């Protein structure tokens, strides 16, 4: 069924398709239809449950940040069977983002390229929505980024302001210093700059607090960031974000578009970083990048991820993707003799 709908949707510009999808989910959430379709999409099995950074996840498959930037449809997304939802990225200031077109499909590669630029309604508006709207029963996190116009030196105050507006209603906070689409943002992954941001947020009461790292960091820089996270007692690390690098295997003309690449081509690289991070910390790792099948999710779990997230796979696989992954994970756990997902975390380390 999704194949027919996908053909129609893929005939439209990617961002138009996203807006149509979001509008449909918004209506479903408003009228309560998400509660009905949740019965079709949700896999309920205690073996899938994971406890990480103070939260209980009914299953390890989450919706990554970027899909619901303004926290408009978390209940509708949870109804698709996801075990957690991460909204955002949210910035202190309202931002239009970069000029369109800024989202591109690479269908032969099951990939996307985006240069959205943290387009969102701003912390005041998103925070008010989070405070006013009921949230789903699964954990909801918020991804926060730096406003484009804020100088790098003022980043700690910028992030802290955003947290003060959006942090109370959610279950965890992710500091995004790794998007390639805000000028200079990745410079904040340096130890001193990152420490200033994280310490300011901790002083403001942000907890659980995680940091999201880039797959393009040199291993020494990743090791430094993990060491800092350990020293500060962060609650977890998200590995990874999109990459600006392009594998030679990409065949679509849009592969040359500026922006971050996500989807199948970054799966192995993301898993390598999950493993690298997990070997250096006792804190939970969130694995992101190229998760589209149960095998993809299981690979990251065995490499050290407590939970995983996806976005691009929802575009290509449709609304059943979380259900298929969770059903497949149960089969993989049974095959390998694990009693639960938690037992499989880090099995390959």
Swiss-Prot record:
Cofactor binding comment, as recorded:
Binds 1 FMN per subunit.
Topological category with respect to the lipid bilayer: Peripheral membrane protein
Q: Where is this region: Disordered?
A: 244-265
Subcellular location as annotated: Cell membrane
Q: Which GO terms describe its cellular component?
A: cytoplasm; plasma membrane
Q: Which cofactors does it use?
A: FMN
The active site lies at: 179 (nucleophile)
- List this protein's GO terms for biological process: 'de novo' pyrimidine nucleobase biosynthetic process; 'de novo' UMP biosynthetic process; pyrimidine ribonucleotide biosynthetic process
**UniProt keyword list:** Cell membrane, Flavoprotein, FMN, Membrane, Oxidoreductase, Pyrimidine biosynthesis
Q: Give the residues the record marks as binding FMN.
A: 65-69, 89, 143, 176, 212, 240, 263, 290, 311-312
Could you tell me which Pfam families the record lists for this protein? DHO_dh
Q: Which intervals carry biased composition (Basic and acidic residues)?
A: 245-255
Q: What is its EC number?
A: 1.3.5.2
Q: Which residues does substrate bind?
A: 69, 114-118, 176, 181, 241-242
Q: Which NCBIfam families match?
A: PRK05286.1-2, PRK05286.2-5, pyrD_sub2
Recorded protein name is Dihydroorotate dehydrogenase (quinone)
């Amino acid at each position: 069924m999704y194949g027919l709908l996908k053909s129609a949707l893929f005939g439209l510009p990617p961002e138009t398709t996203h807006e149509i999808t979001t509008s449909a989910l918004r209506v479903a959430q408003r009228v309560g239809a998400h509660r009905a379709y949740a019965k079709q999409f949700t896999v309920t099995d205690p073996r899938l449950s994971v406890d990480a950074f103070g939260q209980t996840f009914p299953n390890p498959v989450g919706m990554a940040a970027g899909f619901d930037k303004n926290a408009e449809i978390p209940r509708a997304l949870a109804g698709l069977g996801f075990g957690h939802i991460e909204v955002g990225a949210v910035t202190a200031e309202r931002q239009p983002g970069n000029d369109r077109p800024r989202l591109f499909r690479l269908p032969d590669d099951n990939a996307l390229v985006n240069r959205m630029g943290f387009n969102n309604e701003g912390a005041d508006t998103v925070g008010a929505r989070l405070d006013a709207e009921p949230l789903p029963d699964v954990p909801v996190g918020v991804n926060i980024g730096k406003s484009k116009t804020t100088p790098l030196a003022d980043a700690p105050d910028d992030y802290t302001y955003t947290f003060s507006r959006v942090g109370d209603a959610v279950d965890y906070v992710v500091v995004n210093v790794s998007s390639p689409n805000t000028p200079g943002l990745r410079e904040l992954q340096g130890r001193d700059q990152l420490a200033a941001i994280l310490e300011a947020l901790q002083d403001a009461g942000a907890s659980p607090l995680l940091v999201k790292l880039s797959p393009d960091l040199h291993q020494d820089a990743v090791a430094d960031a993990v060491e800092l996270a350990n020293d500060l007692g962060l609650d977890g690390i998200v590995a990874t974000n999109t990459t600006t690098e392009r594998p030679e295997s990409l065949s679509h003309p849009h592969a040359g578009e500026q922006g971050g690449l996500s989807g199948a081509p970054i799966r192995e690289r993301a898993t390598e970083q999950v493993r690298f991070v997990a070997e250096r910390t006792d804190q939970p790792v969130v694995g992101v990048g190229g998760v589209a099948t149960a095998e993809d999710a299981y690979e990251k779990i065995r490499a050290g991820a407590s939970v995983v997230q996806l976005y691009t796979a929802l575009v290509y696989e449709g609304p059943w993707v979380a259900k298929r992954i969770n059903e497949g994970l149960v089969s993989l756990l049974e095959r390998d003799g694990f009693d639960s997902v938690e037992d499989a975390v880090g099995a390959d380390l």
